[in-house]
Amino acid sequence: MRIGLLGGSFNPPHQAHRAISLFALKRLQLDRVWWLVTPGNPLKDNGGLHALAERAAAARKVAADPRIEISCLESVIGTRYTADTIDYLRRRASRLRFVWIMGADNLAQFHRWQKWQHIAAQVPMAVVDRPPRSFRALNAPAARALARYRLPEADAGRLADRAAPAWVYLTGLKLSLSSTGLRNPDGSWKSI
């Protein structure tokens, strides 16, 4: 089974998360996408972060597709770091083929993630274009360091079968929604 992993705070979850997941299911020929709702992002101020249970419940409503599953795995295993989560999944579910899915905004700062090289060496990655961040993302330190492992977009459907490091940059999905834009100044959520 081919599983896409979309990690995030989901504070709040929104239709762009759903659209990215449906896009990835099709373009990467995945069977499922798991939304990994993190207890907290180590690179962000988590002061306005809603309760994990609230974010997970909202994510279930937004996902609205049986192929998208919501998980609070990081809370269960006691981590906030993607590298730990991927190591855990690879040990516990070695028969599954995982692909890490992230937006271009995350690729632009991927070099700041704990053990980012380890993540890239453990699981193939799909980066979804987020205009106008494309140029910055593709010229970021991690993108340059991993450039030789980038596959042509036409090979996206075979990414889950590739050994890491391998990644693809997916274009064609133009979304401007962001969780930041859906939060009020007091941290409460606008209508999702």
Swiss-Prot record:
GO terms for molecular function: ATP binding; nicotinate-nucleotide adenylyltransferase activity. One of its GO terms (biological process) is NAD biosynthetic process. Its EC number is 2.7.7.18. It is an enzyme of class 2 (transferase). Disulfide bonds: none annotated. The keyword Nucleotidyltransferase applies. InterPro entries: Cyt_trans-like, NadD/NMNAT, Rossmann-like_a/b/a_fold. It comes from the Bacteria. Keywords: ATP-binding, NAD, Nucleotide-binding, Nucleotidyltransferase, Pyridine nucleotide biosynthesis, Transferase. The keyword Glycosyltransferase does not apply. It catalyses: nicotinate beta-D-ribonucleotide + ATP + H(+) = deamido-NAD(+) + diphosphate. Pathway: Cofactor biosynthesis; NAD(+) biosynthesis; deamido-NAD(+) from nicotinate D-ribonucleotide: step 1/1. Catalyzes the reversible adenylation of nicotinate mononucleotide (NaMN) to nicotinic acid adenine dinucleotide (NaAD). Belongs to the NadD family. This is Probable nicotinate-nucleotide adenylyltransferase. It comes from Bradyrhizobium sp. (strain BTAi1 / ATCC BAA-1182). The lineage of its organism: Bacteria, Pseudomonadati, Pseudomonadota, Alphaproteobacteria, Hyphomicrobiales.
